[in-house]
Every structure is written in C-alpha cells, then in structure tokens.
Amino acid sequence: VTHENPGLRRALFGALVAAIALLLLWLTWRALAPGGVSLAEWLILLAVLLVTPWAALSAGNSLVGLAILLGSRDPPGAVLPALRQARPGVPNAVTALAVCIRNEDMQAVLPPLARLLDDLAAAEAGDRFRLWLLSDTQDAALAAAEEAAVARFAEGRANVRYRRRTENTGFKAGNVMDFLDHHATDEKFFITLDADSVMTAEAVLRLVAVMEADPRLGIVQQLIVGRPAVAAFPRLFQFGMRAGMRSWATGQAWWQLDAGPYWGHNAIIRCEPFRQHARLEALPDGSRILSHDMVESVRLQAAGWRVRCLPAEEGSLEANPPAMPEFMRRDERWGAGNMQYWQLLRLPNFTAMGRLQLLQAILLFLGAPLYAAILLLAAINAVSGGGAGTPMCALALAVFAHWLCYFSPKLSGYAHALLKGEVAARYGGRIAFAKGALAEIAFMQLFEPLSTLNKAIFLASLPFGRRTGWAPQNRAERGIAWGDAARLLWPHTLIGVALTLAFATVSPAALLLALPFTLGMVLAVPLCVWSADPALSAWLRARRIAATPEELATS
C-alpha cells in the first residue's frame, strides 16, 4: 500500500518552482532597473522571463532530489513503490531483450550481450529471456557481415533471434513496432537496448520483478550512466551528467509519479499496451516523429498505464559521444526531434502531465537561442551605454543565481556524494571525487556556452530548411584534426571573439563578468582538439580524474 498524493506533491513542487522563479526574476529586475531600463534591457528581461521556468524547474527537481537522496535509506524505493514490493528471483514472465542495430560494429555490440546472457543463465533465469537483434542495416555488405557475426554468436545459444528489415520505415520506433507486430510471441515484456547499451543481469532481473509487482506499469525507465570512457571529452562530460541525473531523476520521479519519462533504451515495457497505444503515425505536416520515446510515454499515460522512473544507476550504462563533433550532432538530432513536439501539443487525447512533459522537452532546447540572445543583447546594451547605471554587484549576483539554478542538478549530485561518504568511496574517496568534480566544472563552464551557441545556430536554421537525419553514430574514440575543428567551429569562434571584444571596450568589470560565457567560444577550436587528444585522455586516466565506479572496479 502506498500513500502517494499526486495533487499535493505537484502543488508543493509547483509552489517551490514558482518561488525560485520569482526570486530569479526579482534579482534580474533589481540589477537592470537602476538608471532606467533601455530597449535592450527590456528584451533581456523578456528572454529571462522565458528561460526562468526551465532554470527554476531544474533547481526544484535538484533540491527535492537531494533531500530524498540524503534523507531516505532507499531513495529509489522512495519514489518507486513497486521496487519495494518486487519479488527477487527467477521471473514468471518471458521477456525479450530487444537490441536495435543499424550499420554497427558487431564486435563491439555482441560481447556485452554475451555477458548478460551468461549471467542470466547463471542466475537460472536464462529460459525467461529471449535476445532479439532487430536490424535496420541497409548496406548489403554490412548486412552480410552482421548476419555472419550473429550466426557465430548464436551458436550454442538457443534464445538468440535475428531479424533484419529491408525498409526502415519509422526509424527505431518502426523497428520496435514491427517486432511486436510480426515476431513477438509469448513475451510479456521487452527491454529496449541500443547498440551501445550495457545492462547487468541484476539490473534486468530487477526491472522484470518491478513490472511483475505492479500489473498497471506500462514502462519503467532506469537511470542510464556513461560507460567507462577513454577520451577526455566523454570522461569529463559524463562525470557531471551522472551526478546531475541522480538528483534530477529522483526529484522528478517524486512529483511526476505515474507520468514518468521514457528515454528510448535501458527500459522495460509491457508488450501489449505498447503495441496498442504507442503506434506513431506521421505528424500533421507529414513528417515522421524523430524523438519517439517521449511521445510513446505520454501515449501510454493517456491510455491509463503507469510510466515510472527507477533512479538507480547500478547496472545500466551507455556509451556517450567520443568527441565534441559527435556530441553536437547528437544534440542537433535531439533538438530537431524535440521541436516537432510543438505540433503534438495541439492534438487531443493527451493528459495534462503528458503535455507538460512534451513542453519540458521543448524548453530543454528552446532555452539555447534565448540564452544566446541574452548574451548578444547584453553586449549590445553595454556597447551602446545602456548598462551605464547597472550596479555590477547586483548584476553579478543575478548571473550567479541563474548559473546555480542552471547547473543545480550536478551541483546537488556532487553535494550528495561529498556528504555521503559511502557514495564518494565508490569514486575513490572524497578527495578523488572532488578532483573530478572540479575538473568537470571547469571544462563544462567552457563547453556549455559553446554548446548552447551551437544549438541556437542549429535551431535558428531549422525554419530555413536545415534538416538532420538519424544516421548511424560514430562511437569510436579518436583524435580531432585542427583543420576539421576549425571548419566546424569557425562561426562559434568569431562570435565569441566579437562578444569578448565588445565587453572589453566597456570596462574590465564587464569583461570579467562576460568571460565565463565567451571564453569557451573563443577557445572553441583548441577545446575541441584538446578534449579529444589521446595525451590529455591518458593524463586524466593516469591520475584517475573523473573516474567512475565501473572504471575503478576493473582497474
């Protein structure tokens, strides 16, 4: 029996977010109002008004998550009651392990799956799982190599299946639905895995046990953390992402309850409801939905099924992009997909929480052009003399408050680890963890404004016909040539130099306040090259800076 009160929780959370938003807006007004408000400052206030809901939501999720992480003996169970009711052991139901592949290196894909199948067999649960390799590979030569690799892999494994489509209609969502329509038989659940996903047998068995404990669960999405990375870029990025997702997902799960997220992989899904309710038709403009996962989640919610998040990171991993160019391309794909949600907001048959989820996904990327506009308007205002009466201390306080809220997920995750010694111990102790946190903060302070500018440029180009496909991802860790970095990032560099010079002509104080947001743009090319440099990667690994528990466990 649970005592969740969705209305009360959401009202309390809404009040917290509103209070944070009002504080941010008051601090901004307090900084800009003295001496009169110029036209540029009015536009800045408008942009701040639009980005503040996301910043306040981030801070609210982080504070609630941190409170649960510090105050509960079992944080995942505190926000997912079915976890406490789950029966450990061999499951009753048959579950498909559905791995979506397209033009992948099977020598990288298959070994983690072999370990998973072997460990499930060792737990005497092997006959309860069926591995399905769902291929959308179109290239004939790659398909032949793929089929040969799977055939060798399947020798001696009776529970391995392989299916390749000749037409990849509907992309990944269509791949999964084709499996459910034409190939699934007695499987009650399926666990979605990407080609770079890694899950342990313990994590898989826990997901099935949770689903069996609550027959109204449609999806349970587990937290996903980065696989141990060699390259500096993913190593630093995912160290902070891991800390941030821990607090964010815990806080969000507390108030979203049965209206949780689905991120497309490392999740368990009940087959029949998904097949009935999560089928995706074309958008009103005729295009296919790119970011399918959130839409599938809100469809199940609208049909009365529970979608929950399991904010536990153990045994659920993925590979992050190996370098800055791949990361930016992935962001562009996600941004293009999330912007499609504008068309879905007008459609009927979504719950209020479902629409809120879609709106959050839009705000995640819509904030980029708004933050870029704030920086550009601030430079124009400073050069034109509009900021002459602005008290710098008040402005610095407002900027710092927004910075705290923007980065609050990872900051609260860092606080959790440093305050709880047993968490920091998994990273080598508090000192080792603090070194990783400081390195990540320094790197991301340079990279985040650059990433924001890149998203802003991409989103601004979407109405003019720019498109991004869902091409196979480069997962190989490699260096970046200076020429390649310059060709990709010269616009970002020029914008950064122009903004920095603009603030420098006003005053040293203006330059000092702007540098945290422009320096990464100025250094875009070397930052891209250095973060992929094998020498820097080796230096970080040798000193175990930003090492994860999985890396330390195998070293």
Over which residues does each language-model region extend?
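Basic/Trp-rich segment in TM-proximal cytosolic loops or flexible interdomain/linker regions
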Residues: 1-17, 33-42, 71, 75-80, ...
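N-proximal low-complexity "stem/linker" segments adjacent to membrane-targeting elements
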Residues: 4-110
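Composition- and surface-driven signal marking solvent-exposed, interaction-prone regions
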Residues: 41, 111-112, 192, 205, ...
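Alpha-helical membrane-embedded segments
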Residues: 45-68, 404-407, 514-533
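Internal catalytic domains of large membrane-associated glycosyltransferases
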Residues: 60-63, 67-347
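Transmembrane-cytosolic junction motif
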Residues: 62-79, 419-422, 529-540
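Cytosolic juxtamembrane regulatory segments of multi-pass membrane proteins
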Residues: 80-103, 434-447, 480-485, 529-555
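C-terminal amphipathic alpha-helical interaction region
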Residues: 474, 482-555
